[in-house]
Swiss-Prot record:
Biased composition annotated in UniProt, kind: Polar residues: 219-229, 241-255
One GO BP annotation of this record: negative regulation of cytoplasmic translation
One Pfam family in the UniProt entry: CEBP_ZZ
Protein known as: Cytoplasmic polyadenylation element-binding protein 3
GO cellular component: cytoplasm; neuron projection; nucleus; synapse
Composition bias, Low complexity: 230-240
GO MF term set: mRNA 3'-UTR binding; mRNA regulatory element binding translation repressor activity; ribosome binding; translation factor activity, RNA binding
């Protein structure tokens, strides 16, 4: 071999060594990775494993050797850096395994590095010469299923990125199943503990399966509640009430929990009322042939800054109309109180400057035919329960806004519903009558009749109180057919009505009348005890004797009888009574001799109705017929059964008169329970009005009747009931107290 051949051989050997060295130090090819969504992370920004290693390279790290081709100083990294490095390296190697076609048996620098950091966990059954070096990042193609099941499931799930979504869903389903079974088991244990202690189980979610047969139909159901009355506080007033969930299901964040209210009542000894009843259902669609509408309508959803001129402009095309603002509308319109609140709020000031800050107003037309014309221009939902929709124009600074408002008219025939028309002649028993308050404007007498009958028992008659425009004021009276249903309603105290249109908490109270004490039978009754152990009328002395015992654990709250409120709590003359007295002096002198025996304007807490017809107004709580004339104020208080001392022969009947009687009302501003005090005083806003029924002027001039000056005995009084029992005005009119027929007994 010559020298040239040796030189060529050495050169070839050097080239082979160089190639082998290059092959050893060759950088892995670039990986084309698609973004992998995993645990809220995307694939790392480095495109190759080399870039990733270079990112974590330390400046003072040891240079690579032949044994370890790529030493990046992994031991010098922090724990967080190690975890991040391994997580990103997993993503790259999984992608490289799928995209690169390198033989798996060929070890790579990354594989050798990971093998040193995270050693593989081989089982004794696995073949030692297995070619799967990346089994911790993916499932092996040569490993058996039994071996896969024995591996660590947590590490396998976290490393198997290609099947991550499926594993996550399976894990979520299994967790939900475990949680639901755990919660169900804990609930059963909790119920056992609560039942053993005898305490109610609060449930925060309404279970509609509890009332499979809801009393939503306004027709009388076949399984009507039992008519019997139970005096036990543990039993429910009605068997049907057990089907409904408690009020806790519908308690909002701003509403007081019924459990707190119940505990408060128990701490203060008020055990007179049971838990509230609940009624679920829908209002039936209304269908009238030739209805007679009230001249007053409710307009809801109006802009809070709308003006009276804009309302009249929108509704004036149907006829002359006036706007009645919520609250004391007479005071705001007349300008008697134009003082705005001190806080200067624009929304609060609009109420005092004649604007609707509450979002609703009342429109009053001169003719009821204008209401019918308005409804022809309104739209109505199919199967609506009495609500209509009308578009009004609201003027803005730079444009005109078209707003759709809600219209709720009222048909005058919906104010009363009786199953038997003979009740108009025979009259209604007040001892089976309850007062209901806080009624919604869409609840007619027939709807209230069906609701009360579904919940408590058979109902004879329902009448809603109306104002001088025959529009409901939110209260009424319900007469039951049996005493058992009456006691159930009184013991319940409140009734929750839930419909798709509204939710209301209706108040139920006994309807009181003027009578004698049921203990001594000599003094006039001063108060009424609604506790089921008493449930009778008391005078001052009998109440002190019967309820002054210290050993009685229950607190019996007295409900003041309206006719005795003035006598029990006399006070100085108020501005209201002074105005009433001054107004009474303005009456004509023709009736002065008759009117001197009866106070024309008693205080609001002592309503008197004089000379009421025995078979018309007195029979149905003072129901006003269409032919009778109503003067202000808006509220008409019904007459009640006369006092026991009154004899039937002393009553005066007006049914024989040809002309309808004239009705005179107290001109003092009187408030319904939905309104506030008119004179600005801090008194509560629950007053009664006083009404007087006197014969027409032609009565005394007829040949069969003497003149008014020849009447020796005054007319007999009839008493109306207080709207909210228990409220006692702190100051009463002294003339009403002295001129009371029961005063001085």
């Amino acid at each position: 071999m010559n020298l040239n051949d040796r030189v060529e051989g050495i050169g070839n050997e050097r080239s082979i060594v160089a190639k082998s060295t290059e092959r050893k130090n060759k950088i892995p090819p670039s990986l084309k990775l698609s973004p992998v969504e995993s645990v809220g992370e995307k694939s790392p920004t480095p495109a190759t494993v080399y870039d990733l290693f270079k990112k974590y390279h330390k400046s003072d790290s040891v240079k690579p050797t032949e044994e370890d081709n790529m030493n990046v100083g992994f031991d010098k990294l922090s724990t967080d850096e190690k975890n991040g490095f391994l997580r990103k390296l997993q993503m790259l190697t999984v992608g490289s395994k799928k995209s690169s076609k390198v033989d798996e048996s060929t070890p790579s620098p990354a594989n050798r590095l990971l093998k040193k950091i995270v050693p593989s966990r081989r089982t004794s059954t696995e073949h030692p010469n297995s070619s799967n070096r990346m089994h911790i990042f993916g499932s092996s193609r040569t490993t058996k299923k039994s071996i896969d099941s024995e591996r660590n499931s947590q590490r396998k799930k976290s490393a198997r990125r290609l099947n991550f979504e499926r594993d996550a869903e399976q894990k979520k389903d299994s967790t939900k199943t475990n949680n639901s079974s755990f919660v169900a088991e804990m609930t059963r244990e909790y119920e056992k503990i609560v039942i053993s202690k005898g305490a109610p189980v609060p449930i925060n979610k309404a279970n509609r399966n509890l009332y499979r047969n809801p009393r939503g139909s306004l027709e009388t159901p076949t399984d009507s509640p039992q008519k019997g009355f139970s005096s036990s506080t543990e039993s429910s007033p009605s068997d049907s009430m057990n089907q409904f969930p408690s009020r806790e299901h519908f308690t909002s964040a701003n509403e007081e929990s019924p459990m707190k209210r119940k505990n408060f009542q128990q701490e203060h000894g008020n055990k007179n009322r049971d838990s509230d009843a609940t009624w679920f259902g829908e209002l039936p669609p209304r269908d009238y042939t030739s209805p007679t509408f009230s001249r007053k309508i409710f307009v809801g959803g109006v802009p809070w800054d709308i003006t009276e001129a804009a309302l009249k402009d929108s509704f004036g095309e149907f006829g002359s109309c006036a706007v009645e603002w919520p609250g004391q509308e007479a005071r705001y319109r007349s300008g008697q109180s134009n003082l705005a609140p001190s806080n200067g709020s624009l929304r609060a000031q609009t109420k005092y400057t004649g604007q609707a800050a509450t979002g609703y107003v009342y429109m009053i037309f001169e003719d009821e035919r204008a209401v019918a014309s308005l409804l022809h221009e309104c739209s109505q939902e199919i199967g609506g329960a009495g609500e209509w929709y009308f578009k009004i124009r609201a003027q803005r600074s730079k444009s005109t806004e078209i707003r759709q408002v809600q219209i709720i008219p009222w048909v005058t025939s919906d104010s009363m519903f009786c199953e038997d028309d003979t009740l108009l002649e025979t009259g209604i028993e007040p001892k089976r009558t309850v007062f209901v308050g806080a009624l919604h404007g869409m609840m007619t007498a027939q709807v209230l009749h069906s609701i009360m009958e579904d919940c408590f028992g058979a109902v004879e008659c329902v009448q809603l109180d109306t104002d001088k425009f025959k529009y409901p004021i939110g209260s009424g009276r319900v007469t039951f057919r049996e005493h058992g249903a009456y006691f159930k309603a009184i013991e319940m105290g409140y009734l929750h009505v839930y419909t798709s249109k509204f939710r209301k908490r209706v108040q139920i109270d006994p309807f009181l009348e003027s009578t004698c004490c049921m203990v001594c039978n000599s003094q006039s009754a001063h108060c009424f005890c609604r506790n089921k152990n008493c449930f009778k009328y008391y005078c001052h002395n009998c109440w002190a004797l019967d309820h002054g015992k210290d050993d009685d654990q229950e607190v019996h709250i007295p409900v003041i009888v309206p006719s005795s409120a003035s006598k029990a709590f006399p006070g100085a003359t108020t501005r209201r009574s002074q105005v009433s007295s001054s107004l009474s002096l303005k009456n004509g002198s023709n009736n002065s001799q008759v009117n001197n025996s009866i106070p024309h304007f008693p205080s609001a807490g002592f309503p008197i109705i004089v000379g009421a017809p025995a078979q018309t107004l007195s029979a149905l709580y003072g129901y006003i017929q269409n032919g009778q004339q109503l003067l202000k104020p808006a509220v008409f208080e019904p007459p009640m059964t006369p006092s026991p001392s009154e004899i039937n022969k002393n009553r005066r009947s007006f049914t024989e008169f040809s002309t309808p009687p004239t009705v005179f009302f107290n001109s003092t501003p009187v408030i319904s329970p939905q309104k506030s005090v008119s004179d600005g005083s801090p008194l509560p806003a629950y007053y009664n009005s006083a009404a007087f029924l006197t014969p027409p002027p032609t009565y005394y001039g007829s040949p069969n009747h003497p003149t008014s000056s020849n009447i020796s005995q005054p007319q007999q009084p009839y008493y109306g009931a207080n709207l909210y029992y228990g409220f006692i005005p702190p100051q009463q009119h002294p003339s009403a107290m002295m001129r009371s027929p029961n005063y001085g007994q």
